[in-house]
Amino acid sequence: MAKLTAAEIADLMPQVPGWSEISEDGMSRLNREFQFDDFKTALSFTNRIGDLAEEADHHPRLVTEWGRVTVTWWSHHEGGMVVADIEMATKGDAL
C-alpha cells in the first residue's frame, strides 16, 4: 500500500460520494458522518464497520454518538490515505 498523492486522491474522490478528504496531523484522511434514528442503530452500524475492518485488517477511527457515526479511514503505516481507504469506504457505504 502506497500513500496516495494529492492528484490521486482528487481522481478517486468521485468514487466515494458523501465522503470528504480531511487533514489531521499533517495526513490526508477520508471522513464521513452517517446519520441514524437512534443510538442502537448507530451502534449496530459501528459493529458492522468493525467486522469489515477486521476482515480486511484495515481499521478506521469510529466515533459513535446518539444517532451519528463518524468514520475516518487512513493508513497509520503510510501516513495518509491509501487505495484501501477508498475500497473500505465503498464497502461501508453498501451496508
Briefly describe each language-model feature range.
Residues 21-22, 48-60:
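Short arginine-rich
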Residues 1-37:
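N-terminal first-folded block
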Residues 47-48, 90:
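Solvent-exposed alpha-helix faces
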